[in-house]
UniProtKB/Swiss-Prot annotation:
Pfam family, one: Glyco_hydro_25
Domain of life, source organism: Bacteria
Statement: the UniProt record of this protein carries the keyword Cell cycle: no
Keyword vocabulary terms for this entry: Glycosidase, Hydrolase
Organism name: Escherichia coli (strain K12)
Family: Belongs to the glycosyl hydrolase 25 family.
InterPro entries reported for this sequence: Glyco_hydro_25, Glyco_hydro_25_AS, Glyco_hydro_fam25_subgr, Glycoside_hydrolase_SF
Lineage, broadest ranks: Bacteria, Pseudomonadati, Pseudomonadota, Gammaproteobacteria, Enterobacterales
Cited SUPFAM superfamilies: (Trans)glycosidases (SSF51445)
CDD domains, A to Z: GH25_YegX-like
Protein name, as recorded: Uncharacterized protein YegX
Amino acid sequence: MQLRITSRKKLTSLLCALGLISIVAIYPRQTVNFFYSTAVQITDYIHFYGYRPVKSFAIRIPASYTIHGIDVSRWQERIDWQRVAKMRDNGIRLQFAFIKATEGEKLVDPYFSRNWQLSRENGLLRGAYHYFSPSVSASVQARLFLQTVDFSQGDFPAVLDVEERGKLSAKELRKRVSQWLKMVEKSTGKKPIIYSGAVFYHTNLAGYFNEYPWWVAHYYQRRPDNDGMAWRFWQHSDRGQVDGINGPVDFNVFNGTVEELQAFVDGIKETP
């Protein structure tokens, strides 16, 4: 009896295999397209579980966060901030913007002054960031940033964007980053935010600077792979579309409530 059941199973499997081979032989292109489409759908489900598609912004957005924002630089060119601030879709609006101010020794973003002024005038919380160059003195970079950015009450703390280490060792990079952070904190009275990609963070920065707020870039994940990092902001996409901005733009979420965001801006420490 068991032998007959086993034989039937083998026969059924063989017939299914022959049927599949026949379909592939008769409809090769359609079969390939079917399996490719299925694979894409499975991959999307894994990567975007917990996301919801938002048509106007042209991306999927993490569903469990309520505070959304963008970051911009000269690559977005001339921005219509009034249109940015007015945009709404599916209950989502943009509430903050991080704006590139400076880079390295002497580069000032040509659109910074305009973006800095108009983002605030149109009701967005604003933050300014410096792109760190490992080949330039940390103090020189900090002075450039502080000379360029005129902070006001209600602005985010300064941001240091750390994405490369050049010829430096990880230890030497951290030393220079620390110099920049301390110099800017002393001048502004607030601990700067550190921005970095998840992979670069794991390789060079993990376990250090835990007293600073973090902004991590990690795309197409349910949550950023933080390796114990207490992140405040998450850059989850670089392909968003926003009214008033030409081309793609980075999208971010704040990890917290509206009240926590306000406390963060005001510099109020959370109680345990």
